Amino acid sequence: MAETEEEETVSEEASGFSDLSDSELLDLEDTQESSASASKPGPSYELPGKDDKLIRSPKWKRRLDVSSPMERFHLKYLYVTDLSTQNWCEQQMVYGKEFSGFLTPEKSAILDTGASIHLARELEVHDLVSIPITSKEDAWAVKFLNILSMIPTLQSEGRIREFPVFAEVEGVLLVGVIDELHYTASGELELTELKTRGNPVLPSDAQKKKDYFQVSLYKYIFDAMVQGKVTAASLIHHTKLDPEKPLGPSVLRHAQQGGYSVKSLGDLIELVFLSLTLSDLPLIDSLKIEYVHQGTATVLGTEMVAFAEKEVRSKVQHYMTYWMGHREPQGVDVEEAWKCRMCNYADICEWKKSGGLISATLEPQVKKAK
């Protein structure tokens, strides 16, 4: 990539938000809010914003009495975008968790625009119904009702959007939202991920690799669901949901209107897993990423992604060792130090201060010398 093109894209990509699925944004914000409320704030940090303006953001005190980041950040599960952000820069992802309330107006506007484009695409497929919820069980019940309503459409080779996926991967529950599923002219089930761009240029190769990993994870989880590899017991264990909790009145009313005879979350979970098992849905055959310019809604290009299961599993295993507390977070190698130029956390980055960029480069040479 030419230097000028890299400069155009680095500002957007180095933020860590350019790969965030707008579908998962609200869920991610909810998780961050619950994490922040349970954390103990320490002294504030001033982070450099655009044009070197200081933006004050709380510095969350790291607790030393917990054994893993999952516990420190009070997380019951991870999002697919958590792992894809690790693929960009793991250290940046960690700072994003620690400074969960830090979002510049520019990035907020980018996310809002992207969400609007996603919403327009979704309304092309189906209407949206607002369902008031009163508990986390209700929130998950709505996800399950969405799955139940989409299964028949997939069985009849229709097109769906915003399909919730979840599976236990390497001992951690991984959750996401598939942007679109449809069948090609040859009858193959294809996943399409919409990526909106603030600049009218395609992303760098490094960004594309992160996007490839993200859609590959979606396929990995979806395939596990339709193959019966995901269990209700695992889901309940990780989310700490109460299967005996009665559904809220609005959720119950919506379920009954859909023809589902359920009273509790457990009834709904049982129905979802039974439907997935008996649906005979195919595995995802192809993966496609569509890049769209936010300002004009122009399609900038599409990328077909080859699914490499062995590589995906290897990356997931490595990333999960951080979440399970088996290693410290890592930053980028020196070859990708350009990512740091517009990173909001560059001035406080422990990876840079500890010489991580250099050591990551020298380590292979040391090994060869032995």
Curated annotation (Swiss-Prot):
<comment type="subunit">
    <text>Monomer; monomeric form has weak exonuclease activity. Homodimer; homodimeric form is unsure but has much higher exonuclease activity, suggesting that it could homodimerize upon DNA-binding. Interacts with the replication protein A (RPA) complex.</text>
</comment>
<keyword id="KW-0408">Iron</keyword>
<keyword id="KW-0269">Exonuclease</keyword>
<feature type="binding site">
    <location>
        <position position="340"/>
    </location>
    <ligand>
        <name>[4Fe-4S] cluster</name>
    </ligand>
</feature>
<keyword id="KW-0234">DNA repair</keyword>
<keyword id="KW-0540">Nuclease</keyword>
<protein>
    <recommendedName>
        <fullName>Exonuclease V</fullName>
        <ecNumber>3.1.-.-</ecNumber>
    </recommendedName>
</protein>
<dbReference type="GO" id="GO:0046872">
    <property type="term" value="F:metal ion binding"/>
</dbReference>
<feature type="binding site">
    <location>
        <position position="343"/>
    </location>
    <ligand>
        <name>[4Fe-4S] cluster</name>
    </ligand>
</feature>
<feature type="binding site">
    <location>
        <position position="349"/>
    </location>
    <ligand>
        <name>[4Fe-4S] cluster</name>
    </ligand>
</feature>
<feature type="binding site">
    <location>
        <position position="89"/>
    </location>
    <ligand>
        <name>[4Fe-4S] cluster</name>
    </ligand>
</feature>
<feature type="compositionally biased region" description="Acidic residues">
    <location>
        <begin position="21"/>
        <end position="32"/>
    </location>
</feature>
<dbReference type="GO" id="GO:0005829">
    <property type="term" value="C:cytosol"/>
</dbReference>
<dbReference type="GO" id="GO:0045145">
    <property type="term" value="F:single-stranded DNA 5'-3' DNA exonuclease activity"/>
</dbReference>
<dbReference type="GO" id="GO:0003677">
    <property type="term" value="F:DNA binding"/>
</dbReference>
<keyword id="KW-0378">Hydrolase</keyword>
<keyword id="KW-0238">DNA-binding</keyword>
<dbReference type="GO" id="GO:0005634">
    <property type="term" value="C:nucleus"/>
</dbReference>
<dbReference type="GO" id="GO:0036297">
    <property type="term" value="P:interstrand cross-link repair"/>
</dbReference>
<comment type="function">
    <text>Single-stranded DNA (ssDNA) bidirectional exonuclease involved in DNA repair. Probably involved in DNA repair following ultraviolet (UV) irradiation and interstrand cross-links (ICLs) damage. Has both 5'-3' and 3'-5' exonuclease activities with a strong preference for 5'-ends. Acts as a sliding exonuclease that loads at ssDNA ends and then slides along the ssDNA prior to cutting; however the sliding and the 3'-5' exonuclease activities are abolished upon binding to the replication protein A (RPA) complex that enforces 5'-directionality activity.</text>
</comment>
<feature type="compositionally biased region" description="Acidic residues">
    <location>
        <begin position="1"/>
        <end position="11"/>
    </location>
</feature>
<keyword id="KW-0411">Iron-sulfur</keyword>
<dbReference type="InterPro" id="IPR019190">
    <property type="entry name" value="EXOV"/>
</dbReference>
<keyword id="KW-0963">Cytoplasm</keyword>
<keyword id="KW-0539">Nucleus</keyword>
<keyword id="KW-0479">Metal-binding</keyword>
<keyword id="KW-0227">DNA damage</keyword>
<keyword id="KW-0004">4Fe-4S</keyword>
<dbReference type="GO" id="GO:0005654">
    <property type="term" value="C:nucleoplasm"/>
</dbReference>
<comment type="similarity">
    <text>Belongs to the EXO5 family.</text>
</comment>
<keyword id="KW-0460">Magnesium</keyword>
<dbReference type="InterPro" id="IPR011604">
    <property type="entry name" value="PDDEXK-like_dom_sf"/>
</dbReference>
<dbReference type="GO" id="GO:0051539">
    <property type="term" value="F:4 iron, 4 sulfur cluster binding"/>
</dbReference>
<dbReference type="Pfam" id="PF09810">
    <property type="entry name" value="Exo5"/>
</dbReference>
<feature type="region of interest" description="Disordered">
    <location>
        <begin position="1"/>
        <end position="52"/>
    </location>
</feature>
